[in-house]
Amino acid sequence: VTSNKNKTYVAEIIGSDPSTDLAVLKIKSDELLPFIPFGDSKVARIGEWVLAVGNPFNLNSTVTAGIISAKSRDLNDRDSKNQSFIQTDAAVNVGNSGGALVNTDGELIGINTAISSFTGGFVGYSFAVPSNIVRKIFEDLIEYGNVQKGLLGVSGSALNAELAEKFEVNETQGFLIGEVIEGMGAAEAGLKNGDIIKKVDDVKINTFSDLTGYLSTKRPGEKVMVSYSRDNTREKITVTLKKTNTTQFLGMYLTNINAEQKEYFDLDHGVIIKELGNQRLYRYGIDEGFILLEINNKKIKDVADVDAVDFESLSSIVFLKPNGERERIIFE
C-alpha cells in the first residue's frame, strides 16, 4: 500500500466480499495513520453535494465533485449481487473503483464501484456502495471472516399501477410478495404471497433494492419490524432474519450439509451440490450429490465461505463423492 507521501507499507488481506468488490486490509505500521470516519448513508439526501476520490487513469488522488442523483439504485443489468447503490454525477472513470465518496462534513458515505457508460468512460452517472453496507461488511470480515447476510425470505416485485389492477389492491407503492420461502423468517412470522411490504423498521420500501439495501446492514438473528398491507388493511409483524443456506458458484447450486450428512460422512464442514449446470465439471465426473469440501486449500464450512471466495484467484476445489472418495480439480 502506497500513501500520498509515497511511503510504502506491507498489508495483510483480512477478508474480501466479491459481491460488492470490497476487501479489508490490515496495514503494518508503527505510526498512526490518518483515517476517514464513517458517515450515515441512510440520512444522505438526493441533491446533497459529494466528492469522489480516486486514481483515474493513474492520476493519483484525483477529487471530483457532484451531487447525489438517486439512492437505492438497482443495476440489474450488471453482474452484481449488491443491488442498492448511491447514484451521483461526480466524474468517475477507470481507476476510481475503490475510492471514497465523501460528504461535505468529510465523512465516508460510499465506496465508488461502477459507472454507467457505453464507451467505458464517464458520461454523467456513477455508483457507490453505501457506507452503511460498507461498514457492516468491514465489521463482518474482521469478526467472522465472511459477510453475515440476514435474509427475510421473500421474492416479488415493486408494486405499480398494472400490478395493483391485476391483484385488485388500492395502492401503487410497496413491495408485492410473490413467494415466501419455506423455513425462512418471513414464513415463520406469517407473511403470505400477495402481502405488500410498506416499511422495514422505519425505512420505506418501494423497490427490491430498497429492501435488499436495508437488509444488507443486518445480520442473521436480528429482528426487524415489517409493516405490510393485506386485503387493504395495514399490519405490523416482527420477523427474525435467517442465514442463507444456498448459493451459486461455477454453475453449481450449493446448500449446507445437514447433521445426518455430517454424521454419515464423518464431516465437520462442506456444502452439497443440489444442481449442476457446469458441463466442464460434469465432464470431470462431478455431479449432483457431491460435497464440496475445500476451495484453494481452505475448508468450506458453509455457503457463506463459498460467497467469500475470490473467483479470479481460484486454483483448486476438493470434492467428496457419494462413495466416500475425494477428488481434487485443478484450475490453471
Predicted features and spans:
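Serine-dependent protease modules
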Residues: 1-189, 199-223, 229-248, 255-260, ...
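Intrinsically disordered, low-complexity Ser/Thr/Pro-rich linkers and terminal regions
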Residues: 7, 298-301, 321-323
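Conserved PDZ fold ligand-binding element
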Residues: 186-207, 273, 280-304
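Solvent-exposed segments in extracellular or luminal domains encompassing
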Residues: 214, 307-310
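C-terminal structural cap/anchor segments
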Residues: 236, 241, 245-276, 281-282, ...
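Edge beta-strands of extracellular beta-sandwich domains
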Residues: 237-240, 327-332
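Short, surface-exposed beta-strand/loop "edge" segments at domain boundaries and coil↔beta transitions
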Residues: 280-283, 324-329
